[in-house]
Structures are given as structure tokens and as C-alpha cells.
Amino acid sequence: MRTKGFASITGSAILAVVLTAGGLRAQAWSQVGTESDFLLHDFHFADGSVLPVLRLHVTTLGQPRRDALGKVTNAVVVLHGTGGTGRGFLSPTFAGELFGPGELLDSATHFIILPDGIGAGKSSKPSDGMKARFPNYRYSDMVTAQYRLITEGLKVNHLLLVMGTSMGGMQTWMWGERYPAFMDGLLPLASVPGPMAGRNRMMRKLVSDAIRNDPEWQGGNYVTQPRGLFGAEEMLFMMTSSPLQLLKAAPSRDTADAYVTRWMQTHLSSTDANDFLYQFEASGDYDPSPDLEKIVAPLLAINSADDQVNPPELGIDERMMPRVAHGRFVLIPISDRTRGHGTHSLPAIWKGYLGELLGTIERGSGPTP
């Protein structure tokens, strides 16, 4: 249906609730949720380009609750990392630890919002047909679209919590600056509140160069995936893996070779070069550092000490956090449980800190709308 002449939203419930006497079955998480598409017409990007129709896909769990004044009090948005999807969070290791019965963000009492960002999942992306004619979107465009999805599409006027992993963590910082009174709390995971610089930026440039400098890319108009995508995926593997866990998983030369071969085959089979390129280049405008004082909601930033993307020796969070009025930084030590950059998707390790953040919110340290 049309909504105010500029957007439409359609929904199809996949499976609202799957219950047993013991609660939600772990194997059923992949079937849970209501999926919807929100269409934004004539969407203007920061670089001046316009997309006639921008499709934003979202999965939701639970229902919004409103107070006597009509403000939504239980909505939580979870923002995915580069190349991820909202439904990627619906796993036993993530959803089972946070959204299940009795958990901190139980979907029976919370309205969980899991968007697919621009360029990923079932949202509009280059591989839909435009290829390299697709607008060169940036994080600022993604956050703008997320806000419109939540406010115009889902009719949510306030968020209990904004949280995200990796790219989603970076966008969480941006949410806190751009919409400071819109949320009660912020949880950026595996990110830093500084400019896209140093090795992180270099890795992204190497990914971009591997694809753009490959003659098979053909300016984005390839028919088969260019071989440059192979080198780009190799960079991603090295940056996001955990040396400790890789040695445990592959303690010999042969097992190491087999492991990385399987990893590459799996990722190459499901990745489009243009989508991958755009996803990494989207970070080009990221730098929340000038506006950290604008963040007024309680913020808890969590990184792990074995994260090669945001290595702890840089000390960026420690230097920046004093500028955040209600900010706190936690660095999780390396252990048999951590998984490098991927620790962001293992709430069993860090959800105790989330509980502390929610306690702070309940005590009323957040912004007053």
C-alpha cells in the first residue's frame, strides 16, 4: 500500500513464535521474525545522486509498546557489519543469548528491529541490476535510511537501544551524534570513534584496488565474478580472523590449507564483486570524532583484545571516551572464548556488560526527550 505518497511497506510473517515447553528451540531461530520491505522514493544520497526507489529490508521480532504519551519504550535496533544482514543475527549464539525467553532483550517484551543496510541482504544493492551505476553510498546515507525506515516505515518514535557490530558499531556512534535524544542507550561493538585511517583504511583500499584494478572487473560490467575478488576476500580473512582460534582449528600445514580453502570457497560462492566493493568503500566518510560531545545517551563501547581490525594498542577508545558524557569502554581480554573481530557476535561473552548498561538506562541516566 502507499504511505503518504513516498513510501510503501509490505510484510510477510515467516514465523512469529516457535515455542516448546522449554522456550524457543535453538534450531528455529532461522525461521523466526516478520520480514518487510520499505520503499523510499527519490532517495537523495550525500554525493548528490538520486535513486528513484530505494528498497530497505527489515526483520522484526515482537511488538512495540507505547507509554501513555505514545512514545515507544521497548524498541531495539541491531545494525549488522560489512556484508552482513539483519537475519544474520538470528542464530542460537546471538539471538539465543539475547532475544530468547528471560534474556536481556527477550522478544516477548522487546521490539527487535534487524535492518538490512543499503547494499546488503534484500535491500537495494548493485547486484540487483544497476551494477556500477548504483549510487556510491556512504555510512551517512545508510544511517539516514535506517532512521527513515524506523520512523516512517515502522512508526517507531523512540528507541530503547541502538547497538551494532563492526560497521554497525560505527554507525551506532553516528546514531548517537545525529539523533542524540532518540535513544536511551548505545552499544557499539568492535569499532572505534575515530577516523577511518591507518591499517583499517589501508585494508579497505587494498580490497578496493584488488577489484577495481582487475581488467576482468570491466568497470563493474562483468558477466562472471572477476578474479580480483579472490584477493579482496583474502584481505578480509586475514583482518577478521583470530590467530589463537585458527591455530586451534588448524594445528598442521594440511589442516591450515584445507581450512582456508573451505573458507574462501564458501565466501566466494555467495559474494558479488560490486556489492563487496561498495560495502567496503561505504566507510569512506566515517569519522565521528569531531562530534562526540553531542552524544548524551549512556554509551558502552566493547572491543576484544584479539581484534585485528581495531587492535587495542591504538588506544583510540581510551583517548576519545572522556569526551562522551555518559561513555564507558570495556576491553575483553583474549581467551579461549574470544574470536578476534568476530567476538562482537558472541553475546555470551559480553552480555553481562549489556545488562549493566540496561541497568543504567533504567536508573534514568539517558536523555530527556
Model-derived regions: residue spans:
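Catalytic-loop region of hydrolases
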Residues: A26-A75, G86-G88, S365-P369
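N-terminal cap/lid subdomain of alpha/beta-hydrolase-fold enzymes
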Residues: T59-D128, I316
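Conserved acidic catalytic loop of the alpha/beta-hydrolase fold
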Residues: S140-L160
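Conserved hydrolase catalytic core segment
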Residues: L159-V162, S166-A197
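Alpha/beta-hydrolase-fold enzymes
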Residues: F182-T266
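Short beta-strand/loop motif that positions the catalytic acidic residue
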Residues: I295, A301-N303
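Conserved alpha/beta-hydrolase "acid-adjacent" motif
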Residues: Q308-L314
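Catalytic active-site module of serine/aspartate enzymes centered on a nucleophile-bearing elbow/loop
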Residues: G327-P369
